[in-house]
Amino acid sequence: LKSEGIGADCSSYTELLMSDAVGLKGHDIMFSSNVTPAEDFKKAAELGAIINFDDVSLIDFYEEIGAPFLETMCCRYNPGGNFTLHNEIMDTPKDAKYGMTKEQMKEAFTKLKAHGVKHFGIHAFLASNTVALGYYPKLARILFELAVELSKEVGVHIAFVNLSGGVGIAYRPD
């Protein structure tokens, strides 16, 4: 995968070690985790991975453990409510335990900016096993509108928007 220019989406220390073993480093690794042990954060920082904070409280924990704030960091957004497409509920972000509200995103970006972070990413994962063609355009609109708002209100550089996974497989033809 590395030779094809594909990186790794890691959520654990073991996955970080596996990425390192195949030569992935830096922005080739996105580290998204919740209930994250200190050693996982430190390993992700050591590898220069893009650390994707799932909860605003993790930023304080990250500071407490003495992990270095990197130039580029990311936060996971959860818009709440139901994520619908063509009157069909794709998933229910309001019930998800992952991600931050818009106000928490502002707080998180403000904290990260105060720690010297220069480039910010926004990530969201709103539905699983998605085969609907309109999912990614709708998700992109939500995230890019948020990016503009955060850039203006918090005064940060939004370096990227990550539409995450959730790609489904149509096991039977429609």
Task: Label each residue range with its predicted role.
Residues 1-160, 169:
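Active-site-proximal beta-alpha core segment in soluble small-molecule metabolic enzymes
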